[in-house]
Design a protein with these regions (language model features):
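Structural signal for conserved beta-strand scaffold positions within catalytic alpha/beta enzyme cores
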Residues: 6, 161, 187-189, 234, ...
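Short alpha-helical basic/polar micro-motif
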Residues: 206, 371, 375, 548
């Protein structure tokens, strides 16, 4: 079931269009993304690196820079500990590259997903002590690791935490929240209550990049040297699915602008193995082609393989590693499809029993793909979903949520069932004893206040715009809205009642459907639907008209360009 909504936000779109030399349609789309006022519109359209905030505004950065500067000057050994996802790998690379280039004595360790689980832990601390490490520097993790950080301090380590995840909290008898920060020498996280940094929505790599900007300033080095890292930062920002607004939008735009000129041999090899160097690279390629290969390393082998690719200086070795990462990701895709089939069977069963939050147990599932499967179930059924699997100790897994359900906060309410957990409103991870599984399912559902209407998939339409309005120029102008992603979604238009004059089906699997369409004003245009033919024809029946949402594109074939719409949602009407 779907509910279609149309944005009705107000502004003088003609005036905005004239002032910024854009089509009024573009002005309306910008307003729909809550970009209001000349200053915000200017930054949205033309934001650049000079608009990024002073890194010293971030709580802990000044103190962290002072410690790091001293450690580098004294030749102390610093070890970076990151997460094993794209954001973690890239954060690690940014810190390693920036500190190494200024003469720092630095190495890294990325926790093994299967052996160590998420984040810094006591085993990692003990290994650092054994290796005579002086300072631990975390990235994309650590904010919830109070015990491990305390253990590190007990063993004489200097502990610097950089993270972007939500800060854990306790609730007193009066219902007031109090932050629970790890007892580190310095904590750098823009989500801390006392942090005055104006844009707290950075990913872990964004926090690391800003920390390194401050470090270069303190070392009296030209921070423009760090701009080579922006393409890597763009990958992390897109793949960690943080809001593509404000500073994140600028970082991604600047990174995409530079990515084909990257001097990083490993990144270049990864782009080449997917034939991307000859194409226009946008956020889609980062999120769905490049990023998954980096993630596959941490899922099925060690994330250090991906990090070592970006540190590689030999082109042949880089090419070989990039090909191996692609093969790993292909294997991951197959495993995911099998897991989704099994999970759907359980999901339908629990949904029929009235569960609002789907807690699914797949004992044979590779724990590294639990989050992907949870995301697929969430997308299919529009319910919050957890996928759990057997682990070395107990069970562990990941959850993905829907709008209106903060997964992290709901998990805080039942934290007694977990041995470990953390995350965001929309995604989380957890570990628990196998005997606690049913208790978790029961409690998380008892607390859930979602109603039936919350499970209807919401389709937010930007503009009810007849296809007659589409022009080549408008499609070109739509590119100013890129990069697309969370909170800056690709625009969605709608047309009511287009006549279907012809249906053609293409593709090996008969899942590419081409419609010849005609508007009431006589405009003819092709519409593409990517769906199984049998499913499509069953929906169509004998209907002659279609109402649809779409995104307009330019189709180029044998040198001939034509207008086309890619249809996202639709229903048929008889006449």
């Amino acid at each position: 079931m779907e509910q279609w909504y149309l944005y009705k936000k107000k502004a003088d779109f003609n005036q905005i269009g004239e002032k910024f030399n854009i089509d009024p349609v573009i002005a309306r789309l910008i307003r729909n993304r809550d970009v209001v006022g000349d200053e915000q519109i200017q930054q949205y359209l033309y934001g650049e690196l000079s608009d990024i905030s002073d890194p010293f505004l971030m709580k802990g950065v000044k103190e962290g820079v002072e410690i790091l500067k001293q450690k580098v000057q004294e030749g102390k050994t610093i070890r970076i500990i990151s997460d094993y996802d794209v954001d973690g790998v890239v954060s690690n690379y940014i810190l390693w590259k920036a500190i190494h280039d200024l003469g720092g004595k630095i190495d890294f360790q990325i926790p093994d997903r299967m052996k160590d689980g998420y984040g810094i832990n006591e085993n990692i601390i003990e290994k650092a002590v054994e290796d005579q490490i002086d300072t631990i520097l975390t990235c994309d993790n650590g904010i919830a690791a109070a015990d491990a950080v305390a253990y590190g301090k007990e063993h004489g380590l200097t502990m610097i935490i950089t993270d972007h995840h939500d800060v854990p909290f306790d609730t007193d008898e009066a219902g007031m929240r109090k932050e629970v920060l790890p007892p580190a020498d310095v904590v750098i996280n823009p989500k801390q209550e006392a942090c005055n940094y104006p844009y707290p929505l950075l990913c872990g790599a964004g926090v690391a990049f800003q920390f390194m900007r401050a470090f270069y300033q303190a070392m009296e080095e030209d921070e423009s040297q760090l701009e080579e890292l922006l393409s890597m930062l763009a990958i992390a920002t897109v793949c960690d699915v943080v809001d593509l607004t404000g500073e994140n939008r600028i970082f991604v735009k600047e990174g995409l602008r530079r990515i084909k000129d990257t001097q990083n041999i490993g990144l270049k090899a990864l782009l080449n193995v997917h034939d991307l160097m000859d194409k226009q690279i946008q956020s889609y390629a980062l999120g769905f082609i490049v990023g998954p290969c980096i993630n596959a390393s941490g899922r099925l082998e060690s994330a250090e393989k991906a990090l070592n690719l970006f540190l590689e200086e030999d082109e042949e070795k880089a090419k070989q590693t990039a090909e191996e990462l692609k093969e790993l990701n292909d294997l991951r895709k197959t495993m995911t499809e099998n897991g989704v089939k099994e999970a759907l069977g359980q999901a339908f069963e629990y949904e029929a029993k009235g569960d609002k939050v789907l807690v699914l147990y797949l004992p044979e599932c590779h724990e590294s793909i639990a989050g992907i499967i949870a995301g697929r179930i969430k997308d299919r059924l529009n319910h919050p979903a957890f996928v759990l699997t057997d682990a070395k100790e107990g069970i562990k897994g990941s959850g993905r949520s829907i709008e209106g359900y903060s997964m992290f906060e709901e998990m805080m309410k039942v934290k007694e069932v977990f041995t470990k957990f953390g995350g965001h409103p929309m995604a989380a991870g957890c570990s628990l004893e196998k005997g606690k599984l049913q208790e978790f399912r029961k409690k998380i559902n008892e607390n859930c206040t979602l109603e039936k209407k919350d499970f209807a998939k919401k389709v937010q339409i930007d503009i009810d715009m007849p296809v007659d309005y589409i022009t080549m120029d408008l499609i070109h102008q739509l590119s100013v809205l890129e990069p697309f992603g969370k909170e800056n979604k690709k625009p969605l238009f709608a047309h009511r009642k287009l006549k279907v004059e012809r249906v053609n089906v293409f593709g090996k699997n008969k899942n590419v459907i081409k419609l010849a369409l005609k508007s009431s004003q006589g405009t003819r245009i092709d519409g593409m639907i990517f769906e199984d033919e049998d499913e499509f024809r069953e929906k169509m029946g004998t209907a002659k008209y279609i109402t649809c949402t779409y995104y307009p594109v330019i189709n180029e074939y044998q040198g001939y360009k034509s207008l086309q719409i890619n249809i996202q949602n639709y229903f048929f009407v008889e006449g």
